[in-house]
A protein has these predicted regions:
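Active-site recognition of the HExxH zinc-binding catalytic motif
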Residues: 80-92
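Short pre-active-site segment immediately N-terminal to the catalytic Zn-binding motif
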Residues: 28, 47-50, 61-83, 119-121
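Short, solvent-exposed loop/turn segments at secondary-structure junctions
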Residues: 40-44, 60, 66-68, 87, ...
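Metalloprotease/metallohydrolase-associated module, dominated by Zn2+-dependent proteases
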Residues: 2-7, 12-19, 23, 29-30, ...
Length: 184
C-alpha cells in the first residue's frame, strides 16, 4: 500500500492517572475511553510547529519528542499542557467544531482576563484551554506560580476568582452552554 494511504498507528489510550487527572476538571463530561494519545503530528508534511500539540478530533496529537507515556507522572508544565489539550477534547465531545474553528481562526489568543460577571463561555477555545489548565494548577497542584496567565500568579484570592468565573462549568461540566460563544 502506498505510504500516503497507510493508516497511522492507533495511538494509546489514556492511562488511569491521566483519566483521574482530567476527571478532576471535567468530571464525567468526557468519554475518556474514546480518547487516544498519539506521539505524532496531526498535520501532514511538517505543517504542525515542532512543539505544538493538537486535539482537533477528540484525540491528542503531541509531537513525538513531547509525548509522554503518562502525563500524570510529569512535571506541572506537562500536566497543564495535557489539561489544555483535554479542554479541546471536551469541546469536541460536546459538539464544538474544534477542527474548523481552529482552521478558520488561526492565531486565536490564549490570553484571558477574569472578571465578575464573566463565565467560561465568554472565552475563545484556546483561552478556555489555558483558563482550565490554570484552574487545575491552582486548585489541585498548588501551582499558582506556574499559571499561564501571569497576572494571576501572585494575586491573593485568585482561586476564589477562578471559581466564581467557572461556577457554572464546575457545577455542570457536561453542559453545552459552557462552550465558547454560547449565550446565557
Amino acid at each position: 500500500m502506498p505510504l500516503l494511504f497507510r493508516r497511522a498507528p492507533p495511538g494509546r489510550p489514556l492511562t488511569p492517572g491521566e483519566t483521574g487527572m482530567a476527571r478532576l476538571v471535567f468530571g464525567d463530561a468526557i468519554d475518556y475511553a474514546a480518547v487516544r494519545v498519539h506521539a505524532r503530528a496531526y498535520l501532514p508534511f511538517g505543517l504542525q510547529p515542532p512543539r505544538t500539540a493538537m486535539a482537533p478530533n477528540g484525540h491528542l496529537y503531541f509531537p513525538r519528542a513531547c509525548c509522554q507515556d503518562d502525563f500524570s507522572c510529569c512535571d506541572l508544565g506537562n500536566r497543564m499542557w495535557f489539561i489544555h489539550e483535554m479542554t479541546h477534547v471536551w469541546q469536541f465531545q460536546l459538539g464544538y467544531p474544534v477542527r474548523w474553528r481552529g482552521a478558520l481562526r488561526i492565531g486565536l489568543s490564549y490570553a484571558y482576563r477574569l472578571a465578575a460577571g464573566k463565565r467560561l463561555a465568554d472565552f475563545n477555545m484556546e483561552a478556555q484551554g489555558n483558563l482550565l489548565a490554570d484552574y487545575f494548577a491552582l486548585r489541585f497542584c498548588d501551582g499558582q506560580h506556574r499559571l499561564y496567565e501571569q497576572r494571576y500568579r501572585q494575586m491573593p484570592g485568585a482561586l476564589a476568582l477562578f471559581e466564581t468565573v467557572l461556577a457554572e462549568f464546575i457545577r455542570t461540566p457536561s453542559a453545552r452552554r459552557n462552550l465558547p460563544g454560547r449565550r446565557r
